[in-house]
Amino acid sequence: PKKVNPIKNATDFRHRYKEDLGNAQSMGLNTFRISIEWSRIEPKKGQWNWKEIHYYDDVIKTMRRKGMTPMITTVHYVYPGWVQDQGGFMNKETLKDYEHFVDFIAKRYGGNGTMWITFNEPLVFFGHEVEIGNIKRSDMIPFMKNVQEAHKIAYRTIKKYDKHSHVGSNEAYLPFVTSI
């Protein structure tokens, strides 16, 4: 795959989340969106990284203490290297692994009004996968079918723990290129 340009620390929410959540609270926000990075909490298949899980526990707890409802994104373009090694979302096996991940975080963070976004901007996710060389443009239909199936799996899994939760996806509107 093509080398990805590192973003480095960006806004450094990771180390400044208490300050950032305090700022959000001071603006009167009642919802705060966060992605739970699968690659951080399950860096090896079936092995949970408890240090990272406790980090997310504290972020969610801090968010709720400040009066905000979490809106959790399960995939914001990043997944573990071992998932990439098996073909990413082009491989149906990934759907089972994704279900395992979603089950873990839905059980842990669901309820109390938690909202869920399964995939951040699926079409942009597809474009990103093409750009870095993980898949080809001609893979669009099978890739999107698998992402759609993964969304359904996540929806059912999250609803198992909280039937009243809001579960969806978000969309980015992009120009469509007809020469795939």
What are these regions (language model features)?
Residues I36-W48:
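Glycine-rich, proline-tolerant flexible connector loops at the mouths of alpha/beta enzymes
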Residues P1-I7, E37, V75-D85:
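N-terminal small/glycine-rich loop or linker at the start of catalytic domains
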Residues K3, I41-E42, R137:
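Glycine- and acidic
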Residues H15-E37:
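Catalytic domains of carbohydrate-active enzymes, especially glycoside hydrolases
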Residues N5-K8, K45, M140:
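Surface-exposed cleft-lining segments at the edges of enzyme active sites
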Residues K2-H15, K92:
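Active-site mouth loops of central-metabolism enzymes
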Residues D57-I180:
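Active-site region of glycoside hydrolase catalytic domains
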Residues N49-Y55:
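Charged helix-capping and loop-helix junction motifs
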